[in-house]
Amino acid sequence: MDQHQITIFVVAVVAIVLAAALGFFVARKRRSQRLRERFGPEYDRVLQKEGEVSRAEGVLAMRATRREKFELRPLTAALRSDFSDRWSAVQAEFVDNPKGAVSGADQLVNEVMKARGYPVVDFDQRAADISVDHPVVVENYRAAHEIALRHSRGQASTEDLRRAMVHYRSLFQELLQDSIPVRELPHRREARA
């Protein structure tokens, strides 16, 4: 090989390495952007907890992979109606028995999750699983759970319990809304009219 061929070879190798590095960084940036869009505020929460982008994104990607294995299903109209009626009863109970209502709300949210096809294991895993499909309201779920734990230690006021009910309701409503087939959603009916 003469000097000219060596120079061409070196330039070609450097160009290939630079192109590969650029491709890697572009792919990584796209992955980060997709995860940030999918998980919203949950992305930032996990990043803060993990302290490193690659670890946080690995956690979120594992959650998404785990979630893809679930066979989520919509609720039937009868189940939606039953759950809605039971939620109304839990809310009404709050007036006379706030702690019982919060406990009932937690139990009812778990039942809806189970009926939809989410595995109902320990709280942290439930929150991680639900964060894939409901990244905004999962923080409400965590807040409600934290209030319930504080209440069990005698550290939550009635106002705290009221906030827990509001937080549980946000997830409850989203789980029920997700189970309505698209053709039944109000905005879809209006768009067709």
Segment roles from a protein language model:
Residues 1-3, 101, 184, 189:
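A generic alpha-helix propensity feature with a strong bias for hydrophobic helices
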Residues 18-32:
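Cytosolic-side junction of a single-pass transmembrane alpha-helix
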